[in-house]
């Protein structure tokens, strides 16, 4: 009888105080851009580069690096869609723009080995897209005569959807 009481008491304690790992939930939630938002971002970026006289490709990826939208202007080089995708992927993967990554991974720096990560591309034009302090996607631009111009176009595109990203 005492054993049954003891067993019941121990069982009650375990049920009353569930085991947990640092109070972490079993599931997480996150925000991603809708397809429509990604399309607006890509088109606004392409339009800005066109206005500046450049034919480019633009790729928008979600927070996991999966392509949501890719646009290639009529005379953009055949390599530009893949280059834009890799820039966008690099920006979200390393959580920083690719101009900064280019600087931080130059030959001779402690981070130079990052340049050998498959699909990583350390060339200007990749920028993470953030909303309320969280990365919700990334954008990559390729085709302007320099990564700095690709980067400028990407940032103009992001600014064009800023009101959609506020929550």
Language-model features and meaning:
Residues 22-167:
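Flexible, solvent-exposed loop/hinge segments and secondary-structure transition points
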